Amino acid sequence: TGKKYQNFKAVASLYPEACQIVVRKDSDIETIDDLQGKKVSVGEEESGSELNARQILEMSGLPEDLIKTKHLDYTDAADKLAAGKIDAFFFTAGAQTTVVEELAKHCDIRLLNLDDKLRGKLTTAYPFYSDYTIPAGTYTGQEEDIQTVCVQSILVASDALDNATVKKLTKTIFAHQKGLQYATSVDLQLNESSAI
């Protein structure tokens, strides 16, 4: 969003959040360029999804004014895609997001791949992106791996929180990560080196 947040510190990198673009399976949209003239949700205003969508569009060379953008959270976007009221939606979240899995169970969907060139541009221009593969079978009906980019979900704390408490918190998270993973369905990727 371009805003600077002060009085916070990064504690640990938790898990990758994949940049995902969902379309109906019967759609003629195969690439980012095919979004031209389409109704596309880029995420809620000032959300991480919106920021990622804008960066992806910028690096793809497709001017955003050539797309009929909507600002929907991904629950509303999934409902509107199923109803045929939008053509695609961007969202950034851990792979196998429940909302998309539920959508896939009653509406045939596809995820768009980001080609090598676009992923290279993104990771060069914005070093917080990494290449990411959403494995086949992550969502119902997904028959192939999807190549995209991801950002890391970061645990932050107030600068006022003392280091001893931060250390205790991270130790607890690392000790109970299997339970956290089960409770959240998120692919936590914690290790001692991810603590910041």
Sequence positions of predicted segments:
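Extracytoplasmic
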Residues: 5-8, 16-18, 37, 106-109, ...
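Segments of small-molecule ligand-sensing domains
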Residues: 138-196
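Short, solvent-exposed amphipathic alpha-helical segments in soluble enzyme
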Residues: 57-59, 105-106, 171-175
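Bilobed "Venus flytrap"/periplasmic-binding protein-like clamshell domains
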Residues: 16-83
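Pocket-lining segment of extracytoplasmic ligand-binding domains
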Residues: 27, 63-154, 161
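A structural signal for short loop-to-beta-strand junctions that line the ligand-binding cleft
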Residues: 4-14, 138-146
